[in-house]
């Protein structure tokens, strides 16, 4: 057996460490390069080298974690493959990454690693040669039988395939043209074998051993094809083509070698995907689209970018819950108990949820209503939505809409775009796996708007019970039924929600909590939760209700309970430190007692008198349990109080009045201050005021000027023209906060009346209401939140418009008992209630008109 042109590899080779795939002599493989050592090798040898020798590498398979950048070189496999780098493809952005196309030349054995950094270089010993033999070359006698047997099985395997496939025809020609010594490595790299089996073939240096190990692999492949042909009934010649391509996906002849892309697993996935599509319960339209796409997918090469897009699309279509749903639990009594146990107060909201459950019990095919909980932060809107899902026994999914400004987030991106994906609605359905979950659309009032569209407009179809049974996501491009989904939205205010979207939702107001409700919530839910989170027990800490009230009034001013929860958490952390220190000191004291007793025995034996032992006076005794949290402890833990009852001090001079304002965070009290000085009759307004509030100020001064004689109001010069040589400055404190709205009109009038009459406004009175130029008081919104704010501030009387009297029914009974309400229809009634002794009309004597 003579060789014509043997290949001699260098005695020193740079080593390329791989962990995916095994390169055999005569085969071609693509491998990714992303580890630091391999990147240095590519840059130094392949990108900068110009000689043929610089393109020859030593490929070491089965390297554990070659991508690791550890300092030490990982254990190396004993035998590798000398390879020729045929192609280098890659880039340095966003991070360096290269792909190598390498062709195996021969086996080698590592003799000694000469260098490890920046990439390993080893002294190697060539084990075999890839040589070209003439076609008339005879095999050695001892290998003749094995060679003939191997050749017979190889020909049988190829003839079972479709010879019309170019790759199969090329393989048949290679069996006759290539030397028999090269066939075991080449066929092993083509047929379906595991990396472990390929590694065993690589380690088989003896040609006889390679023949013996490869023949069973060929037999196994032949039996598998026979079984596949029996189980499949060929309808067309295309079926045979599919069978042929399955075991041999891609065969390329490069310098007498073959390439196997090892894509069998992907092909099996396509078969399973097709089976799932045919057995799925998706609608007819969606099924037709999927069948069409799977046919296109079969014809695509996997290298096409559209292949991955189409496959991802089909996998999503199969995973969507077209007809899968959960059974509702409609036990009204259990639902009522669950709602009462988990949420204190909130009677109106719980009543509406129970009404929905009752109607569902009476009529199963009820279209899901669109509920919108509107209220300040921290009152439990999101947790109620989660509780509704728990009560019904449905899956729950939260979609955060705050800051979303692209309508594609709702409807999805069209598949023509790179990186396209379905919208949040379809993604949520895929996540929960059922078609009747509870979807919580959180912060729907904070949707944005941009050049990419208006997501609020995209929600119109989602939240319309008359349309959402035919919701079409841009990514799916087929209709999906959302009518069984229960949508619950949350918002802090309805002012920023578009009118069309607001019309599709049932608004349920969730007001803030009263002080009594906060105390009850703290002791029912917040304190036990904080104790559990901090590893404390009720025997270690005691927080009386008086302390809780101090936290609410002096350290938090909010409609919800989030700040209260944080303050309780701070208290528990401080107590946890004390408890841990006490346990440490107890253990230290115990050790000191033992040492003291042992030391006493020794000294008594020596002197019959105990000497001084280790001093334990520096060890403070552990705190007594439970630790009581009082006002002094609050001051030590939380610092000085953040809020004080300063209402009476701030109303100690004329020209100050208290109004009531509504914000998305709940109700607040609002001071209005006025002063006058010599000037040219100008009105100055400060405090970040909106246009509506500025107009209210002008209305107030105009009404007072027109009624100055009626109330005997004069400026500093005794003129009834209040702006004659007089400037007025109106200020609304908290200047960093934007303020607007008409409800401050009565407060501005009262403040100016106090200024010009030089009388003090009652310090326990707050007011709200819009005014007109005729002196009428018009109704305003947010009465409940405003009244609760007045109650939190310790006020005793609230002046509201008469037409808002109906809103007092929604105020808790204990708040109504603590406050007195004055309903006013005109400014005369407001002024009479705001000042001690009233604000009566003054008439000058002698101005009696007689008709006699």
From Swiss-Prot:
Its EC number is 3.4.21.53. It is found in: Peroxisome matrix. The modification N-acetylserine is found at residue 2. One of its GO terms (biological process) is protein processing. It is an enzyme of class 3 (hydrolase). InterPro entries: AAA+_ATPase (IPR003593), ATPase_AAA_core (IPR003959), Lon_bac/euk-typ (IPR004815), Lon_lid (IPR054594), Lon_proteolytic (IPR008269), Lon_Prtase (IPR027065), Lon_prtase_N (IPR003111), Lon_prtase_N_sf (IPR046336). Residues 13-222 form the Lon N-terminal domain. Its main location: other. A motif (Microbody targeting signal) lies at residues 850-852. ATP binds at residues 375-382. Residues 651-837 form the Lon proteolytic domain. It holds the Pfam family AAA. ATP-dependent serine protease that mediates the selective degradation of misfolded and unassembled polypeptides in the peroxisomal matrix. Necessary for type 2 peroxisome targeting signal (PTS2)-containing protein processing and facilitates peroxisome matrix protein import. May indirectly regulate peroxisomal fatty acid beta-oxidation through degradation of the self-processed forms of TYSND1. Belongs to the peptidase S16 family. Interacts with PEX5. Interacts with TYSND1. May interact with enzymes involved in beta-oxidation of fatty acids, including ACOX1/AOX. This is Lon protease homolog 2, peroxisomal.
